[in-house]
A protein has these predicted regions:
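Bacterial Sec-dependent N-terminal signal peptides
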Residues: 1-25
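Feature for soluble, non-membrane regions of globular proteins
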Residues: 24-226
Length: 226
């Protein structure tokens, strides 16, 4: 087992034994470098910390069942393939079919949890705020466009704020397990618009979920990625 995986698992065990210890947010590089055997990354907050915007019950199913399921599936699919010693980033960029779908969903969900905070909401500051104002005219205009992308994505998928190779901001939407790393873009923010992200709390009311989502966005973390 690789050293980084041993350190990661030790951190998870520490959280289990001492619930008062909170996990640190993972950077994009830390998520990219995860390797077999994959583990369910610890949340950077308590299971009930996102209430009343996202309920503990939703996290128990979304994180504890769906996210864990993608981790389990990936661990079952990868052994014996060319991706047995690959990083999660390499799996996303080079694999197809079930390995890609489950690998990307492990990455996407880990990133999504790290985009949220019980102390989130508000607006970005600094260089990110300037870039948003330059590209979209105002934060409210950006928020409206990102929300529109999230609401108009047909079926299941993800909406993303990314930075392209030229450092320009872009809002994209990706069906199913789509991940912008495949196109050489840097993810800054994502919103999970699979129904399992909100059905227990909002049923099929995706707009209501988006309203709550904005109250949780960790703009400090998004700004650091930018």
């Amino acid at each position: 087992m690789k050293l980084r995986n041993i350190i990661f698992i030790a951190g998870v065990l520490l959280l289990v034994m001492n619930p008062d210890v909170k996990a640190q947010k993972l950077s994009i590089n830390q998520i990219n470098e995860l390797t077999m055997p994959f583990e369910l990354p610890a949340l950077p907050y308590a299971m009930d910390a996102l209430e009343p915007h996202i309920s503990q019950k939703t996290l128990e199913f979304h994180y504890g069942k769906h996210h864990q399921g993608y981790v389990n599936n990936l661990n079952n699919l990868v052994p014996g393939t060319e991706f047995e010693n690959a990083t999660l980033e390499e799996i996303i960029k080079k694999s197809e079919g079930g390995i890609f779908n489950n690998g990307a969903q492990v990455w996407n969900h880990t990133f999504y949890w790290n985009c949220l905070s019980p102390n989130g909401g508000g607006e970005p500051e600094g260089a990110l705020a300037e870039a948003i104002n330059k590209k979209y005219g105002s934060f409210e205009a950006f928020k409206e466009e990102f929300t529109k992308a999230s609401l108009t994505l047909f079926g299941s998928g993800w909406s993303w704020l990314v930075k392209d190779a030229n450092g320009e901001l872009e809002i994209i939407k990706a069906s199913n397990a789509g991940n912008p790393l495949r196109d050489g873009k840097t993810p800054l923010l994502t919103c999970d618009v699979w129904e399992h992200a909100y059905y227990l709390d909002r049923q099929n009311a995706r707009p209501a979920y988006l309203g709550e989502y904005w109250e949780l966005v960790d703009w400090k973390a998004v700004g650091e990625r930018f």
